[in-house]
UniProtKB/Swiss-Prot annotation:
SUPFAM superfamilies for the chain: Putative methyltransferase TM0872, insert domain (SSF81799), S-adenosyl-L-methionine-dependent methyltransferases (SSF53335)
Name of the encoding gene: rsmH
Organism: Rickettsia akari (strain Hartford)
Keyword Iron: no
Lineage: Bacteria, Pseudomonadati, Pseudomonadota, Alphaproteobacteria, Rickettsiales
UniProt-listed Enzyme Commission number(s): 2.1.1.199
Name of protein: Ribosomal RNA small subunit methyltransferase H
Length: 306
């Protein structure tokens, strides 16, 4: 059963996306459909949604029933979506790079250290699982991945504990892994759970989340219309750095000119973006109180000007 999902920074996303009737929007990470539904409700526009998680198809079908002519869903990850989109172009594109509540809250999905279940973490249900990760990789590789993708300073201690544990028993549940991590670095009441960074790192690695983001950005220009907006909500410093650098590398400030001029002057034809949010937006204190998972969110937006 799908759990209630609260779209992070929804009001901010709608404000910068600025949906208009008759326009087309791409929701790259459908999840429980929060962004797609809100965009459809905002005006008489059209939405195409993508997701590689087969568990969201039922929710997509529900939205399709209410918006038969204005909503379509494609079961794919966004990095591999270009061929399936068949040269469609969009007035706005939204990416929410976080793991959804419907994944975290279902124990059998194996994403959460708060709910004991099979150690899986695969968004698509296919490929290399988290259980295989902790039971087969060398200690150094485990440590390097936890450090790189989780920014975990105790990565080597955690990796050593994982390897020591698996000598006597297979690590096959989220509960086992969480306890191994907690016991290796200690648990202090009131602090963020010690297992947080390790679970995050393994999830990012298992699903190639950063690679998928980079592959998508390489081609996003082709599916974004002129004046279209790219809106990205990230939850990890590495994700945000990729987005920040991509915007910076592909954007250029306009030359100072008359306020009566209508068009932007482009010095370099390869600079096709205009950054809308010079500084990443963060969720309000109120939203964080209502949804603690929003605490690390950052929103960046840019507009296509070529």
């Amino acid at each position: 059963m799908l759990q209630t999902h609260i779209p992070v920074m929804l009001s901010e996303v709608l404000k910068v996306l600025d949906p208009k009737g008759g326009e087309f929007y791409l929701d790259c990470t459908f999840g429980a459909g929060g962004y797609s539904k809100a965009i459809l409700e905002s005006c008489d526009c059209y939405v195409v949604a993508l997701d590689r998680d087969p568990n969201v198809i039922k929710k997509a079908e529900e939205i399709k029933q209410n918006y038969v002519e204005r909503f379509d869903f494609i079961a794919t990850n966004f990095a591999d979506s270009f061929a399936k989109l068949k040269e469609k172009q969009f007035d706005g594109i939204v990416l929410d790079l976080g793991v959804s509540s419907m994944q975290l809250d279902v124990a059998d999905r194996g994403f959460s250290f708060l709910h004991d279940g099979p150690l899986d973490m695969r968004m698509s249900g296919q490929g290399f699982s988290a259980e295989e990760f902790v039971n087969t990789l060398e200690e150094k590789e485990i440590a390097d991945i936890i450090y790189k993708y989780g920014n975990e300073s105790f990565s080597r201690r955690i990796a050593k504990s994982i390897v020591e544990y698996r000598k006597t028993a297979r690590i096959d549940s989220t509960g086992k892994l969480a306890e191994i991590v907690r016991s290796s670095i200690g648990f202090r009441k009131g602090k963020i759970d010690p297992a947080t960074k390790t679970f995050q790192a393994i999830r990012i690695y298992i699903n190639d989340e950063l690679g998928e983001l980079e592959r998508f950005l390489m081609n996003v220009k082709n599916i974004l219309k002129k004046d279209g907006r790219l809106v990205v909500v990230s939850f990890h410093s590495l994700e945000d750095m990729i987005i920040k650098n991509f915007f910076k590398e592909n954007s250029e400030k306009p030359v100072a000119r008359s306020k009566y001029a209508k068009d932007d002057i482009i010095i370099d034809p390869n600079k096709w973006l205009r950054i809308i949010t010079n500084k990443a937006l963060a969720p309000s204190d109120k939203e964080i109180r209502l949804n603690i998972r929003a605490r690390s969110a950052k929103l960046r937006t840019a507009k296509k000007i070529l």
